[in-house]
């Protein structure tokens, strides 16, 4: 196979993955929530169809925490660490609250409220062979913090492909760890994020670990998932 055919095949596979991945909806009481964090594949599909540019793309940098918040050149949802990702089903990061809101609207959804997000993450509302129905747990993984992409549990030391992480409460994936997730709850110019990220320990994945961040903020640690009425 020539180098040109390999390039064509690679581009075809990328296009196929952009179109092929569908994020399942899980019914939680009177609303639905996506099983996975919104992926690079999904966000790219939205951006391609709407000619959408994130602020990280416009500014030419994303943020990582070092000696304070440090700019990282060419870090955006397409190249989260400044280079092509290992997988297009990694979470879409470097996305602000407002940009996440626009994506969810595009797919006829919205950001979940913190109350909705918390119910989905900690209370087992569906029949399950693993978790007790109607019980509210401490962690998105159950009574104990385990198998979540947090700095003290898994050795990835970065966000990870959502299809390779285990299911937790209600069959949802990465409600604890991996990346913080925007919710629609607001306070002045800030919005509430939940679930913590891989950079933190698992203790931050509890309900009390939620944090407000500036709504126009974007960084390597922050992504989202959408909720739906039906």
List each language-model region with its residue ranges:
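Short, compositionally biased
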Residues: 2-80, 97-98, 123-127, 218-230
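Functional-site microenvironments in short loops/helix caps that host divalent-cation chemistry
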Residues: 53, 64-65, 71-211, 220
């Amino acid at each position: 196979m020539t180098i040109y055919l390999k390039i064509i095949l690679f581009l075809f596979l990328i296009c196929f993955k952009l179109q092929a991945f569908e994020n399942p909806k899980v019914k939680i009481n009177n609303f639905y929530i996506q099983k996975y964090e919104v992926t690079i594949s999904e966000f790219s599909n939205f951006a391609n169809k709407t000619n959408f540019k994130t602020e990280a793309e416009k500014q030419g940098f994303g943020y990582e925490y070092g000696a304070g918040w440090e700019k990282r050149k060419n870090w955006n949802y397409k190249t989260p660490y400044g280079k092509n990702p290992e997988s297009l089903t990694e979470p879409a990061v470097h996305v602000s609250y407002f940009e996440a809101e626009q994506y969810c609207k595009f797919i006829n959804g919205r950001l979940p409220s913190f109350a909705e997000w918390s119910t989905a993450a900690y209370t087992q509302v569906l029949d399950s062979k693993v978790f007790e129905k109607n019980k509210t747990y401490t962690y998105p993984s159950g009574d104990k913090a385990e198998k979540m992409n947090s700095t003290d549990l898994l050795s990835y030391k970065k966000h990870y492909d959502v299809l390779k992480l285990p299911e937790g409460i209600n069959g949802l994936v990465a409600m604890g760890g991996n990346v913080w997730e925007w919710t629609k709850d607001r306070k002045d110019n800030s919005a509430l994020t939940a679930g913590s990220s891989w950079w933190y320990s698992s203790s931050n994945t509890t309900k009390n670990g939620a944090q407000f961040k500036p709504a126009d903020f974007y960084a390597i640690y922050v992504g989202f998932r959408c909720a739906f009425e039906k």
